[in-house]
A protein has these predicted regions:
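Residue-level hotspots at or immediately adjacent to binding/recognition sites across diverse folds
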Residues: 1-221
């Protein structure tokens, strides 16, 4: 996936990891200036071999581009996140084909972090309560992680839990982090967690933040 060029998203697809084909003709037309933020590298999320979502910004509306057939067809859906040439949806994650969360903000503002959830595969989005972080949400991750089918019984307490990390302008070398047990209805700060650009989980007991200067921080629930 790439920023739009002349109104077209120059996206490519692989089914074997070796060969690639353009699916640009399958993508929705881009809005003027529409792009995806590099930030944490989580502007694209997948579920299985057929479902994928792309978070965008940089234009008048922050959108989610979604496919349910492996990229043969795509639809664009509006989100309520702030959007402008320096703002939009930055990170997206889904815990199953229907339930997901997207986060972002304005890279030029330190009071713009926002997030929204979907329960219909990305078609409609509802703002969460305000996340208690400064800057823009660079990354978010479900705590259930990539191994959620093999979780221990107690780990399912975290099926709806999400961790976010945010960075502040202008240098994006400091910031804050928080987590929610219920997809944004309630939030809790993670004191002392600052300067991390991305977070991901294998299981609730094994998650990692990565950030400036080669920082790595393990987080466990």
């Amino acid at each position: 996936h790439s920023d739009s060029v002349n109104g077209v998203f120059p996206d490519i697809r692989t089914t074997d990891g070796t060969t690639w084909q353009s699916i640009s003709a399958n993508m929705p037309p881009a809005l003027p200036g529409e792009a995806s933020f590099a930030a944490s590298g989580t502007c694209v999320a997948t579920q299985g071999g057929r479902n994928a979502w792309i978070a965008t910004g940089g234009s008048a509306i922050a959108r989610i581009l979604a496919t349910r057939d492996g990229g043969d067809t795509w639809n664009a859906y509006d989100t309520p996140l702030v959007s402008s040439p320096s703002a939009g949806a930055i990170s997206v994650a889904f815990r199953n084909p229907w339930n997901g969360i997207v986060g972002g903000g304005d890279l030029g503002s330190n009071d713009s972090a926002d997030a929204a959830t979907s329960n219909d595969g990305g078609r409609t989005w509802t703002l969460t309560n305000k996340p208690p972080v400064q800057g823009s949400i660079f990354c978010l991750s479900y705590v259930q992680g990539i191994g959620h089918h093999d979780l221990e019984a107690g780990d399912h307490d975290y099926d709806n839990a999400v961790v976010i990390t945010a960075e502040t302008a202008p240098n994006f070398d400091s910031g804050s982090a928080a987590w929610t047990p219920d997809e944004g209805q309630t939030w809790f700060q993670l004191p002392g967690v600052s300067g991390y650009w991305a977070v991901a989980f294998a299981t609730p007991k094994a998650g990692w933040f990565v950030g400036n200067g080669g920082q790595i921080l393990k987080i466990s629930f």
